[in-house]
Amino acid sequence: MKFYVQYLIICITALFSNPIDFNLNLSSIVEFDNDNNNYGVSDVWGYTDEFGNEYAIVGHQDGTSILDVSTDPYNPSEVANIPGPSNGDYYYHRDYKTYGDYLYIVNEMTGPDVGMQVIDLSPLPLSSPQQVYTYSNVQQSHNLWIDDNGLAFIEHHAGDNIHIADVGSSPDSPTYSSTFSDLAQNCHDIYTRDDIAYISEGWSYQFGIYDISNLNQITSLATISIPGMGYAHNAWLNDAGTHLVTTEETVDKTVKVW
């Protein structure tokens, strides 16, 4: 049985005083194996190599697939499949971020290579990427963010709400930096910009904003409570940094702009 991944469909409706429609066409569909529950893939990320070739990074049941979407966008090809933990979570939660030529993978499963997998993407396109390290200070995680300073903020399933690792100093072998557990009530998703962290606090039904300029003295700047108690899913700033866009993982909830 196949699960169809429609990874290049984006439906955008821009609501301005003069509405504009951005129409995109479907280029291709990629198939991945799944189980009988019809849960097949999780996160999608992207990477561009030194020659300008673009790749889609897709989480699936048994690990991570890297697809070449530049050579033939109408027929993407898999250039690498990276095995990962696959036990204990039938939704296959995996999350991805890149820093330079390295890919960092966290997941909620258990099994071989449990922890944050570090993949060297620099061999592309001439040869396959290789796993070079497993950061085992965090075993299971739902979400990962890496800032411009090379700090990886990792949602920690067991223990601290957020675990911080230094990937900037040694991208192929991250080291422990700090933890962030005193203020945020919960962490489903984290996003940072300019030393400010925006944390989607899940079942706490709120978004927390924190000053992280001093990791030894993190302070709360604001808390945004969600009307109607929606599950706080994620948050992202606009380019100007003047508005925060949030979503809730609750049926019939709306995208909100603050």
What are the residue ranges of the model-derived segments?
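Feature marking well-ordered beta-strand scaffolds used for ligand recognition
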Residues: 18-258
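Sec-dependent signal peptide recognition
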Residues: 2-10
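Sec/Tat signal peptide C-region and signal peptidase I cleavage site
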Residues: 13-17
